[in-house]
Amino acid sequence: MPCAAPYPDADREAVYRAIRERRDMRHFAGGQVEPAVLERLLRAAHHGPSVGFMQPWRFIRVSDPALRRRLHACVEAERLRTADVMGDGTAQQADGPAVQGAGRQAEFLRLKLEGILDAAELIAVALADGREGHVFGRRTMPHMDVASAGCAIENLWLAARAEGLGMGWVSIFDPADVARLLGLPPGAEPLALLCLGPVRDFYPEPMLERERWARRAPLASVVFEGAWGRSAPWLSAEEAEQENPAARRPEGATESDRKRGPAHREPEPGGARSDG
């Protein structure tokens, strides 16, 4: 029985390239996103898969500068609360020694975590109210509404990369505060603040990987055969590339581009930037 044909080679590679080069962007170049492009991106998001075809996502475009500032203040408040939690204990730095809590806290505060005030567009994503009525695929796993919305966000992310636009997912906020600011009805829940717009450059590797906050796990550590922890012998030599993710760089990037990269940390005198 004949099977469906794959995409032509160039089309197939374009899909995989968008996946490889997608980045969680924090640095934006201002400008604007044309309405037709924004609609195209949101249509791609709306074509995301959802459990039971529940389509739980709702998108709110935030165009009021004052509302943006209030949302930014929510993120900043939670950023500081998160830093306080990091002040205790130790954490393992990628490719480095364990970092004491105070050191990890300082590292966190120096990171730029969002571009709410800089991005051309700010899109809030919320889970719709009335989700309890959707039980298809959710009776034993009600959190599949979150998983479904995540699929829509990834669609938007990949489409944005294909359009040459950066996107960053911000989740450092108190949901109750954001729900109040956005006027969400009872039962609806904010899930993400998406910063979207033109960027000068895409990071040659994930920002947190470059900052040695964490690194991508080897594929063999997350793929099993038949049972948890049982290695998959069919994995190819790609595993060597997974072990050394810094060796990968976007098409057209030079080795000096990889080493230099964008300036990921932008502290103000006396401390971190107020926008993370």
Residue spans for each PLM region:
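Small-aliphatic-rich amphipathic alpha-helix that forms the alpha element of a beta-alpha
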Residues: 45-46, 123, 131-181
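Extreme N-terminal tail/first-helix region
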Residues: 1-18, 105-109
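A glycine-rich helix N-cap at a beta->alpha junction
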Residues: 80-91, 184-206
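Short amphipathic alpha-helical segments
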Residues: 38-43
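Generic N-terminal amphipathic, Lys/Arg-enriched alpha-helix
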Residues: 14-31
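Glycine-rich phosphate/pyrophosphate-binding beta-alpha loops
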Residues: 47-52
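Glycine/small-residue-rich phosphate/adenosyl-binding loop
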Residues: 55-149
